[in-house]
């Protein structure tokens, strides 16, 4: 028996809910509840309101999804590139 197919959709995080849950509006306007995948939690990837994310939805329940990718913001600069030389790591 093959593993069921998952739908991959993009959306924007509207609200960060308690217990590591998120409310996401998909590109087609549907609002779903979502949680961060285990790999994102393991690597301490933060998801904030307004972030663009990729979700996986099961074909059996289209109201819940798993966030498996947070897209990089084009406006943001690199991670800590503007540090003062006084705080350089050794």
Curated annotation (Swiss-Prot):
Keyword check for Manganese: no
PROSITE patterns, alphabetized: S1_IF1_TYPE
Signal peptide: none
Pfam families found in the cross-reference section: eIF-1a
Keywords linked to the UniProt accession: Cytoplasm, Initiation factor, Protein biosynthesis, RNA-binding, rRNA-binding
Entries under InterPro entries matching the protein: NA-bd_OB-fold, RNA-binding_domain_S1_IF1, TIF_IF1
GO CC aspect terms: cytosol
Domain S1-like, chain residue ranges per copy: 1-72
Compartments in which it is found: Cytoplasm
GO MF terms, alphabetically ordered: ribosome binding; rRNA binding; translation initiation factor activity
Assembly with partners or alone: Component of the 30S ribosomal translation pre-initiation complex which assembles on the 30S ribosome in the order IF-2 and IF-3, IF-1 and N-formylmethionyl-tRNA(fMet); mRNA recruitment can occur at any time during PIC assembly.
Similarity annotation: Belongs to the IF-1 family.
Function: One of the essential components for the initiation of protein synthesis. Stabilizes the binding of IF-2 and IF-3 on the 30S subunit to which N-formylmethionyl-tRNA(fMet) subsequently binds. Helps modulate mRNA selection, yielding the 30S pre-initiation complex (PIC). Upon addition of the 50S ribosomal subunit IF-1, IF-2 and IF-3 are released leaving the mature 70S translation initiation complex.
PANTHER family, sorted: TRANSLATION INITIATION FACTOR IF-1, CHLOROPLASTIC
Name used for this protein in its record: Translation initiation factor IF-1 2
Source organism: Paraburkholderia xenovorans (strain LB400)
């Amino acid at each position: 028996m093959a593993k069921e197919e998952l739908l991959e959709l993009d959306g924007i995080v509207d609200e960060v809910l308690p217990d590591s849950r998120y409310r996401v509006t998909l590109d087609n306007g549907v609002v779903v509840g979502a949680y961060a995948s285990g790999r994102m939690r393991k690597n301490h990837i933060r998801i904030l309101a307004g972030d663009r994310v990729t979700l996986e939805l099961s074909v059996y329940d289209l109201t819940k999804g798993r966030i498996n990718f947070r897209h990089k913001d084009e406006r943001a600069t690199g991670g800590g590139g503007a540090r003062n030389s006084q705080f350089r790591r050794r």
